[in-house]
Amino acid sequence: FVFSLGSGAISWSSKKQPTVALSSTEAEYRGAAVAACEAVWLKRILKDLGVPIKDPTSLYCDNMSSIYLARNPVFHARTKHIEVHYHFIRERVLAGDVDLQHISTNLQTADIFTKALGADKLWQFMTDLGLTIPDLPSLRGSTEDTTQ
């Protein structure tokens, strides 16, 4: 996940999940749950800094099944193996703290942390995150003779 404020990233994470997911839905659902925890934490920090945010935090997910799972409070036989703490996202969606929305895979900026991307997509996501690459000569120092 990646959270942005203004034009730059303020929080991001990319971790290997602790257990093997049995489906892409489960993997995305777990990732959304971790992002929801981060969203709640960031809102609390902003509130402590005097910037309360009343609107729900939008979380974008490219898996429709995991969005449906988070919005539906009914437990299904197919989801009983998912560890209970991952259902935290359901509570936050139902409480109105988090708004889980679908986003096209082509626009999923957080993919910069987890996937090999082509140059065009890499530059697009870097721009979206507010990342820049400094001029290489300024990093290495000048190799030109400046004594003349």
Identify what each model region corresponds to.
Residues F1-S7:
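Acidic, metal-ligating active-site segments
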Residues G8-I10, L22:
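Short, well-ordered secondary-structure "scaffold" segments embedded in the functional core
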Residues K15-Q148:
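RNase H-like nuclease module associated with reverse transcription
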